Regions:
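Conserved beta-strand-loop-alpha-helix hinge in the C-terminal portion
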Residues: 214-232
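ABC family nucleotide-binding domain
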Residues: 2-204, 209
Length: 232
């Protein structure tokens, strides 16, 4: 199994402010699978994503990726693993303001010993003609495309997406979802996406519904819908 999650528990606070955010999560994700974590605010989906990405630690349980247990890694090895094998896309773009589109993407390439071709990626992203622009010269959709480029140029094994369309309008959101779909198809990255948008589940290979820190439903999507055909 490519990604195996066993018995993950996580809580925050103490005393009266103690909250159990994750209450024993078990989940398996295949290599190349597009998995959507769906649920309302406070369901634990973003916390789970952060634990998968090594950004946060679990109170108990284990995360195994390609046979390696994250909790067994020392901080230096974990940091190196994140840099080489994981890509992150967030709702906020977090681009470096004084670097061009191309330079922002190249930042990701420098972190990898097996980067994708930047020119080819710029074409895929629809950014080739904008590669010399600074972030403040771009639309929101173009900024998110640049952020996606920076994440995937590393050629990561896993792409972690936390509400990547949350700050975008309907049409731009669909363009970004089509791009993520293309990335999954062309490069074979395993994708784990957090969203509260129920419609996005229809383009996923696997749908995991969370509520109150527990998985309420986990199923494979037998009839996927292309991102271009999604409606909400």
């Amino acid at each position: 199994m490519f990604l195996e999650i066993k018995g993950i528990k996580k809580s925050f606070g103490a005393g009266e402010s103690h909250v159990d955010v994750l209450k024993g999560i078990d989940l398996e994700i295949e290599k190349g699978e597009f998995c959507v974590l769906l649920g309302p605010s406070g369901s634990g989906k973003s916390t789970l994503l952060n634990i998968i990405g090594g950004i946060d630690g679990a109170d108990s349980g284990s995360i195994t990726i390609q046979g390696e247990q994250l909790e067994d890694m020392k901080e230096k090895k974990l940091s190196l693993y994140r840099r080489k094998h994981l890509g992150y896309i967030f709702q906020m773009y977090n681009l470096i303001p004084n670097l061009t589109v191309r330079e922002n993407i190249e930042v990701g390439a420098y972190l990898s010993d097996r980067p994708l071709d930047v020119d080819e990626l710029l074409e895929t992203l629809g950014l080739y003609e904008h590669q010399r622009k600074l972030p403040n010269q771009l639309s929101g959709g173009q900024q998110q495309r640049t952020a996606i480029g920076r994440a995937i140029v590393k050629n990561p094994d896993i792409l972690l997406c936390d509400e990547p369309t949350g700050a975008l309008d309907y049409n731009t959101s669909k363009e970004i979802l089509k791009l993520i779909e293309t990335v999954n198809h062309n490069y074979g990255n395993t994708i784990v996406m957090v969203t509260h948008n129920d419609a996005i589940k229809d383009m996923a290979d696997r749908v995991v519904k969370l509520r109150d820190g527990m998985i309420r439903r986990n199923y494979q999507n037998e009839q996927k819908i292309p991102a271009a055909d999604l409606e909400w």
